[in-house]
Structures are given as C-alpha cells and as structure tokens.
C-alpha cells in the first residue's frame, strides 16, 4: 500500500520517537524519509495457506 505519509528512516537512532512528514526528507535531521505504511501481506507467511482456506470456507 502506498502512503503519502513518510517516516524518518533513521528515527530509532536519531530521534526520541518516529518523525512523520509528507516530504522526501526528514524535517529534523535531513535524512531520507520512507513509506510509513507496512506491506499488506508477507509472501513468505507460514500461515497463509490456512488463512486462505478459512476465507474460502466462509465464502461457501
């Protein structure tokens, strides 16, 4: 999922908490800002097979 909100890539080492911005760079330290939205799923999810099977059973 693509989000307009970005977070400072180095916030764990340079800031007390996450620093959010809409620009490409961090307003406090000038570092790179990255997409703050997590991936919607993990392709290597070990439980994905069971989750999909449960979803399929609920459709019937």
UniProtKB/Swiss-Prot annotation:
Residues 49-60 have a biased composition (Basic residues). One of its GO terms (biological process) is rRNA processing. GO terms for molecular function: snoRNA binding. The keyword Phosphoprotein does not apply. The keyword NAD does not apply. Pfam families: Nop10p. GO terms for cellular component: ribonucleoprotein complex. InterPro entries: H/ACA_rnp_Nop10, H/ACA_rnp_Nop10_sf, Nop10_arc-typ. Keywords: Ribonucleoprotein, Ribosome biogenesis, rRNA processing. Residues 37-60 are annotated as: Disordered. Belongs to the NOP10 family. Involved in ribosome biogenesis; more specifically in 18S rRNA pseudouridylation and in cleavage of pre-rRNA. This is Ribosome biogenesis protein Nop10. The gene is nop10.
């Amino acid at each position: 999922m693509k989000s307009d909100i970005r977070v400072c890539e180095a916030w764990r080492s340079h800031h007390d908490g996450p620093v959010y911005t809409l620009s490409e760079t961090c307003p406090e330290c000038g570092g790179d800002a990255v997409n703050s939205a997590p991936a919607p799923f993990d392709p290597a999810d070990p439980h994905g097979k069971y989750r999909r099977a449960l979803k399929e059973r609920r459709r019937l």
